[in-house]
């Protein structure tokens, strides 16, 4: 949510996106959240057992929700792997994605043409982090750096599952407060950049015509769930 919400806000009309988001949050998001808490506290069963208790024929809903959670876990753990990769790369100075790579041909320094046409961050993302092939017909080799980061991410998940819910309670104070510290650092850094005020005005200036676009409401509903 932290990295996706600003992107959706900028994509879907800035401040105008907050209107469908808040409407759907009040009408759908918060009621479903409290309904889930109430049902779980009253019946005291898991996702599958709750629906089987309500009606045995509805047990498939519980299985479906577990499958959805599985796919969501696979999707987000890849993002965690990317984050781990960038975490270790960020200890370098200068940052590897701050400048285009330069190759030397004798005494002549040549900037990578592909990077020069796009940007240093885009080049690093596609060529260093993802290590994608030149075309879809080429499968490419194993990206061992990203594979190791993904294994580390799944190792963390495995340790959390084995230790149980009590282990997560021990780090709850850190995990709940540290993201806000990081966001505060990002806020200060963003405000110190050149053109920060123009960017903020562009992001939060409402584009009311966007509210008539069904895709905006769809993105808002997806963000809530």
Swiss-Prot record:
Gene Ontology molecular function: any one: symporter activity
Keyword Magnesium: no
Keyword Membrane: yes
Membrane topology qualifier: Multi-pass membrane protein
Bilayer-spanning residue ranges: 1-8, 16-35, 60-80, 144-162, 171-188, 224-225
Glycosylation sites: 105
Extracellular side: 81-143
GO cellular component: cell projection; membrane; postsynapse; synaptic vesicle; synaptic vesicle membrane
Reaction catalysed by this enzyme: L-proline(in) + Na(+)(in) = L-proline(out) + Na(+)(out); L-leucine(in) + Na(+)(in) = L-leucine(out) + Na(+)(out); glycine(in) + Na(+)(in) = glycine(out) + Na(+)(out); L-alanine(in) + Na(+)(in) = L-alanine(out) + Na(+)(out)
This protein's UniProt keywords: Amino-acid transport, Cell projection, Cytoplasmic vesicle, Glycoprotein, Ion transport, Membrane, Neurotransmitter transport, Sodium, Sodium transport, Symport, Synapse, Transmembrane, Transmembrane helix, Transport
Pfam families: SNF
GO biological process: alanine transport; glycine transport; L-leucine transport; neurotransmitter transport; neutral amino acid transport; proline transport; sodium ion transmembrane transport
InterPro entries assigned to the protein according to its UniProt record, in alphabetical order: Na/ntran_symport, SNS_sf
Domain of life of the native organism: Eukaryota
Compartments (UniProt record): Cytoplasmic vesicle, Secretory vesicle, Synaptic vesicle membrane; Postsynapse; Presynapse
Family: Belongs to the sodium:neurotransmitter symporter (SNF) (TC 2.A.22) family.
Described function: Synaptic vesicle transporter with apparent selectivity for neutral amino acids. The transport is sodium-coupled but chloride-independent, likely driven by the proton electrochemical gradient generated by vacuolar H(+)-ATPase in an overall electrogenic mechanism. May contribute to the synaptic uptake of neurotransmitter precursors in a process coupled in part to vesicle exocytosis.
Name of the protein in question: Sodium-dependent neutral amino acid transporter SLC6A17
Species annotation: Bos taurus (Bovine)
């Amino acid at each position: 949510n932290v990295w996706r919400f600003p992107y959706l806000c900028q994509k879907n009309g800035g401040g105008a996106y907050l209107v469908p988001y808040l409407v759907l949050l009040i009408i759908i998001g918060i009621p479903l959240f409290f309904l889930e808490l109430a049902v779980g506290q009253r019946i005291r069963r898991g996702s599958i057992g709750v629906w089987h208790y309500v009606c045995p024929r509805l047990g498939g809903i519980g299985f479906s929700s577990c499958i959805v959670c599985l796919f969501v876990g696979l999707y987000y753990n890849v993002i965690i792997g990317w984050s781990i990769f960038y975490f270790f790369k960020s200890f370098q100075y200068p940052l590897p994605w701050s400048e285009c790579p330069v190759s030397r041909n004798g005494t002549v320094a040549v900037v990578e043409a592909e990077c020069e046409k796009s940007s240093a961050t885009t080049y690093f993302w596609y060529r260093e982090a993802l290590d994608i092939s030149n075309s879809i017909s080429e499968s490419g080799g194993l990206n061992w750096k990203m594979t190791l980061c993904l294994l580390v991410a799944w190792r963390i998940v495995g340790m959390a599952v084995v230790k149980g819910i009590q282990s997560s309670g021990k780090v709850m104070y850190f995990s709940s407060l540290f993201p806000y510290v990081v966001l505060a650092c990002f806020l200060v850094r963003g405000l110190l950049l050149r053109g920060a005020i123009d960017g903020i005005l562009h992001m939060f200036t409402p584009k009311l015509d966007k509210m008539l676009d069904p895709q905006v409401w769809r993105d808002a509903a997806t963000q809530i769930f």
